[in-house]
Amino acid sequence: MNPDNTIAVITETIPIGMQFDKVYLSTFNMWREILSNTTKTLDISSFYWSLSDEVGTNFGTIILNEIVQLPKRGVRVRVAVNKSNKPLKDVERLQMAGVEVRYIDITNILGGVLHTKFWISDNTHIYLGSANMDWRSLTQVKELGIAIFNNRNLAADLTQIFEVYWYLGVNNLPYNWKNFYPSYYNTDHPLSINVSGVPHSVFIASAPQQLCTMERTNDLTALLSCIRNASKFVYVSVMNFIPIIYSKAGKILFWPYIEDELRRSAIDRQVSVKLLISCWQRSSFIMRNFLRSIAMLKSKNIDIEVKLFIVPDADPPIPYSRVNHAKYMVTDKTAYIGTSNWTGNYFTDTCGASINITPDDGLGLRQQLEDIFMRDWNSKYSYELYDTSPTKRCKLLKNMKQCTNDIYCDEIQPEKEIPEYSLE
């Protein structure tokens, strides 16, 4: 690694069995690259750990073993993980190896979870993306993230978010806690970096607002700004898109901020909008009608489209896998790579983060993300909302083996809606 240059790389996991003409550096290989070059410190923010319970490959075990070896090399490793009611044997193994671990009880503080997924190596290199510390995220779940090397300024800014989590692992929030962990960059004052000789503006946003310092851009604000600043197109690839908040009392509340901004951009400014939403057996049924209402806007003067992305099943099936888990957006100006699903609670009471990058020439990383989106959009794994699915993989499409007519299929009753955090 050349310490004089910032290097930024898009990473992805393509589930075993899926085929594309072009793929980018794998999450597995990128994580190994980071681990092999870590010499002093490694901080990891994680939702949960399940690297060792794998089937068919040993990618997860390799990553876990390499992390376990770091303390023996004199590396200080800190892991912030969402507090769970179930024991995490991977985490217990980390602790036995000398890794410092803190369980973060966001549920008790805000009602949500610690859903942020990022790494910080040697206070210089970072990874942020959709991949969990789960073997499935290396072989069986479609993931997307970004690694940025050799930039201490950006790493220091992300470390401030980690330090907030780390503090929450042992303390309640003090009255003036926001003075402890200031942010250095935001949407109004982004960091200027050079990637491959091209100037880029970049900042890291965080959610929820309650855990943002005065200087930190809230993730929702960053997301909406990205949409508003687009002049030609907005392409979105996320696991869930539901304009709903699930309240603690079990009620659902309408939360239209993202949907309204997308509709407004398509209608008022004639921006082309494409939504590529994941579909599998655990998809929330309520999402179907929201997506259909958006797709119905398409007309001569309104360019807005919605597709569902289905990852083919494994044989034999593997629980909690085979889904497009990515959470990103790309416009003609900016690349937005996040860790949150686009459902209200992920922005109001759940911890998440995003990297927002705008290249001066409009190309580079932004172009790569656009290419990935269009590759997936035009692939055989993408379906129109009213297509008939050849399998039972997608809960939101009619299944040709079960549906004899449209009326029967459209009258399938949705199950009781509850927040889902497993895998997500």
Swiss-Prot record:
It is found in: Virion. Its main location: virion. This is Virion nicking-joining enzyme. Induction: Expressed in the intermediate phase of the viral replicative cycle. GO terms for cellular component: virion component. SMART domains: PLDc (SM00155). Residues 110-137, 320-346 form the PLD phosphodiesterase domain. DNA nicking enzyme that cleaves extruded cruciform DNA at its tip. Probably nicks viral hairpins. The keyword Nuclease applies. GO terms for molecular function: endonuclease activity. The keyword Hydrolase applies. Belongs to the orthopoxvirus OPG042 family. Pfam families: PLDc, PLDc_3. Keywords: Endonuclease, Hydrolase, Nuclease, Repeat, Virion.
